[in-house]
Amino acid sequence: MDRNTLIGLVLIALIMMAWFQLMAPKKPLPEEKAQQERLEAVAESIDIKNQLVQDSLQKANPTQKFGELGQFAVGEEKKIQIETDLFTATLSTKGATLRSFIQKDYLNYKHEPFNLISNEDGTLSLFFATRDGKVVNTGELYFDPKTDQKNFRISGDNKVRIPFEISTEDGRRIEITYIFSGNSYEFGYETNLAGFGKFVSGNEYQVVWTGGLSNAEKNVNDEATNSYAEAYLGGSTLRLDASHVDETYKEQPSGNAKWVAVRSKYFVAGLISKEETEGVFMEGSRNTNDEKSVFEDYMVALKLKLPSDQTTVNSRFSVYIGPLKYDLVKATGSELEKIIDFGWEWVTRPFAEYLIIPIFNFLNNHVDSYGVIIILFALFIKLVTYPLTMASTKSMKKMAALQPQLKAIQEQYKDNPEKLQAEISGIYREAGVNPLGGCLPTVIQMPLLFAMFYVFRSSIQLRQEGFLWSNDLSVPDSILDLPFSIPLYGDHVSVIPILMGVAVFFQQKLTPSTQTNDQMKFMMYLFPGMMLIFFNNMPSGLGLYYLMFNVFSIAQQFYINQTTETEPVVLKDKSKQKAKPARKKK
């Protein structure tokens, strides 16, 4: 990584920081004001979380609370377990909810299986208000499982349907059906409401996911930073991030939504609608415990229409719960892959989706070690950008050769800026040099370099994959934990950033420069220091990529310096030009 690349990285980083500040979602209003505006905009909307709190506090008779559905508020809970090739899920007859979801191939930081469902009462239920003022959360009702089997084991393309049902004597019926496949993290979720058209207020019901995803990483604060709720509607995503403690964040836009989801750093739970929806509901809060660790709790819902003139309403959904792996979430066919953060939509994301990930997957099919894959990838990118590096080096060498003339002119016309600019432009023109030629090739490859940053920062493929001294390429390769924290640097010492700083230092010594000796000396130490600080808290896989990119840059720069020579730049000496003699008249 040459000096121009580093300068470009710094400049674009500053631009990105400014962009994020300008384009960041507006901070939600305080709860009371937000609720007032929401009620004015959607008078019939159901405030799900408030109802949950209210219901949990009530000690009322089930009939008073749920009306004629109160008879199902008392019962005996039974559990049904489904084991597939990828996970083990547990369903409960209380609420027909999903109680646990334990992946087989992905463990927590202790290398133990963990339950992605954080809500102790389970998740996935229906919400609706009745015309007599009752608010029904089916998660509190006991369903009848339409199977006597308690354990299922399926694999491959085999599927199993598990229906739950409650029905009243007057013909009202709620049926919830799960459809699991043996080889997919995505499963079907179907609802059937019969006789509720004139029973439900607002002609609307909601399918709800309750709770954030369980923490699985050692650095819970970092995991919380990368956790949020998001919806895809109107061709774009809407994100809700509970970024501050003791604040409640809410969004409930109207419109046809393809999906609404909750994610952590490496996992996601998404509700995907197979038909038109009325909008989404998202709510989140950030909580801390006594140890100052953070957990972000979310609730999301899809809103669906329930016409009063229809006796039966059937709705189909799918639920994806599992790793945030690009190919897997893209396979849902719902554009759920949009929830993976690849940076700017029209700048870095295309590089990530159509270049970096396909090449990474190709290498993954032929190489077992992710560390080796990263090294090969760095070599590939260096070879691809070689023409740009060559063009940049040639331009910088020409600029370096012009420095004596430029300094002389600057001294000669230091009191005449206009004349100085004109003379410098003339020299550039005569020498055939573009002053931006040294940095323009670097700027062109900046989107690719930043796309690499986003991909390696969020790639689950690197999670818990070791290489050399690093036990996990998705976290810093710390070799020493400090008893204190250094501002910007952190509370640990990582090896790869130190090696990167050394590589950047030597790479700069090989790179042609147009700067003065004092400037060169300053930059020689500034950029290695910046790399040391910046990458100390980054995933070691990302650091390994940039380290090897710099090592290959050193080799490439050495080769260029040995095989190319600077063509002498010959300028006309105007002071020695003689006037042509006048032609004699005959």
Swiss-Prot record:
Q: Which gene encodes it?
A: yidC
Please name the source species.
Chloroherpeton thalassium (strain ATCC 35110 / GB-78)
**A Pfam match:** YidC_periplas
Q: Which Gene Ontology cellular component terms are annotated?
A: plasma membrane
What family does the database annotate? Belongs to the OXA1/ALB3/YidC family. Type 1 subfamily.
Tell me the subunit arrangement: Interacts with the Sec translocase complex via SecD. Specifically interacts with transmembrane segments of nascent integral membrane proteins during membrane integration.
Q: What is this protein called?
A: Membrane protein insertase YidC
Q: How does it sit in the bilayer?
A: Multi-pass membrane protein
For this UniProt entry, the molecular function terms from Gene Ontology, in alphabetical order, are:
membrane insertase activity
Predominantly, its location class is membrane
Cited InterPro entries: Membr_insert_YidC (IPR019998), Membr_insert_YidC_N (IPR028053), YidC/ALB3/OXA1/COX18 (IPR001708), YidC/Oxa/ALB_C (IPR028055), YidC_ALB_C (IPR047196), YidC_periplasmic_sf (IPR038221)
Where, subcellularly, is it found? Cell inner membrane
Q: Does the keyword Transmembrane apply?
A: yes
Function per UniProt: Required for the insertion and/or proper folding and/or complex formation of integral membrane proteins into the membrane. Involved in integration of membrane proteins that insert both dependently and independently of the Sec translocase complex, as well as at least some lipoproteins. Aids folding of multispanning membrane proteins.
Ranges in coiled-coil conformation? none
Keywords from the UniProt entry: Cell inner membrane, Cell membrane, Chaperone, Membrane, Protein transport, Transmembrane, Transmembrane helix, Transport
Report TM segments: 5-25, 371-391, 436-456, 486-506, 522-542
Any one GO biological process: protein insertion into membrane
